[in-house]
UniProtKB/Swiss-Prot annotation:
InterPro entries found in the cross-reference section: ATPase_NBD (IPR043129), N-acetyl-D-glucosamine_kinase (IPR023505), ROK (IPR000600), ROK_cs (IPR049874)
Binding site for ATP: 4-11, 133-140
PANTHER family hit by this protein: N-ACETYL-D-GLUCOSAMINE KINASE, ROK (REPRESSOR, ORF, KINASE) FAMILY
Domain of life: Bacteria
Gene: nagK
Keyword field: ATP-binding, Carbohydrate metabolism, Kinase, Metal-binding, Nucleotide-binding, Transferase, Zinc
Function: Catalyzes the phosphorylation of N-acetyl-D-glucosamine (GlcNAc) derived from cell-wall degradation, yielding GlcNAc-6-P.
Enzymatic reactions: N-acetyl-D-glucosamine + ATP = N-acetyl-D-glucosamine 6-phosphate + ADP + H(+)
A Gene Ontology molecular function term of the record: ATP binding
Name of the protein: N-acetyl-D-glucosamine kinase
Amino-acid positions noted as binding Zn(2+) in the UniProt annotation, renumbered to this chain: 157, 178, 180, 185
Family membership: Belongs to the ROK (NagC/XylR) family. NagK subfamily.
């Protein structure tokens, strides 16, 4: 059996999958917030209960909102302070008596979609999350590309380029401070949160993303103008990412991935921001939704 765990700030979810990545069982518990030993024991207890239920020792993969530094072995997950800067893989492996693997949750999302039956024809898959934040993961031949340290795929911390700043009005462009310490990171522009902040700054009105999208479908002039600008901003930024990775397929997740107009508009807006001979890859909506994180974490032990 393949166990995937989604490690969040408020809850930890374990799901059990077979070799076809079909979910057989899941359990969710609150995340301990103050005691590291309690945090470790919570994960160990979840795994042990799954072992007992299925009568075998399953593989253990974690999806975390950060990464485990491959050089130091320490977790860098600032929003789960109880486990931040701790050797979580070493400690869990010792307690569980087996190898434990971990990846950024966006990488797990990309891996889950890459392992979908329909998508296994694509040797390179780029997963982009347009949710509370903007991030991504890159899968090559069924495996996550993590990079030297483990930070590959931190696409939300790429910054606005020349064309994006020009689109937003140069000196009048909204420049947002990012939690990483830099300014103008894509995380604050291409996320659902960024979608709302941009609308407020450019249109002078505070609306939810859902309301803006509803107004767009009602042909509201302000919303249509804004959505067209957002699509162009996304095309500029994603075009750079396509140039870097040249993926066979792109899959979108997160709340904004449910905005169906993006799948019509983005492929049309991308070509001017690519090299002349580049191809716009298929852009698809994620199929596995909220299960993508645990499913991708389980797939860390699968190989093509």
């Amino acid at each position: 059996m393949y166990y995937g765990l989604d490690i969040g700030g408020t809850k930890i979810e374990l799901a059990v999958f077979n070799e076809k990545l079909e979910k057989l069982y899941s359990e969710r518990v609150p995340t301990p917030k103050t005691d590291y030993e309690e945090w470790l024991n919570t994960i160990v207890d979840l795994v042990n209960r799954a072992d007992e239920k299925f009568g075998e020792v399953g593989t253990v993969g974690l999806g975390v909102p950060g990464f485990v530094n491959q050089q130091t072995g320490l977790a860098e997950i600032a929003n789960i302070r109880v486990a931040d800067n701790k050797p979580i893989l070493c400690d869990l492996s010792t307690r569980l008596g087996r190898e434990v693997r971990a990846e950024n949750d966006a990488n797990c999302f990309a891996l889950s979609e890459a392992w979908d039956t329909e998508n296994q024809q694509y040797s390179t898959v780029l997963g982009l999350i347009l949710g509370t934040g903007f991030g991504g993961g890159f899968v090559l031949n069924g495996k996550v590309h993590s990079g030297q340290v483990g930070m590959a795929g931190e696409l939300g911390h790429l910054q606005l380029n020349y064309h994006a700043l020009k689109l937003l009005g140069w000196d009048n462009a909204p420049i947002y401070q990012c939690g990483c310490g830099n300014k103008a990171c894509l995380d604050n522009y291409l996320s659902g949160r960024g979608f709302e902040m941009l609308y407020q700054d450019l249109k002078g009105e505070t609306l939810s993303a859902r309301k803006i999208i509803n107004l767009f479908y009602q042909s509201n002039e302000s919303a249509v103008d804004f959505v067209n600008l957002f699509v162009e901003l996304a095309a500029i930024s994603i075009g750079n990412i396509i140039t870097a990775f040249d993926p066979h397929m792109i899959v979108l997740g997160g709340g904004l991935s449910n905005f169906d107009y993006l799948y019509e508009a983005l492929p049309k807006a991308l070509p001017p921001h690519l090299m002349r001979k580049a191809k716009v890859p298929p852009i698809k909506k994620a199929k596995h939704g909220d299960s993508g994180g645990v499913r991708g974490a389980a797939a860390l032990f699968l190989t093509k």
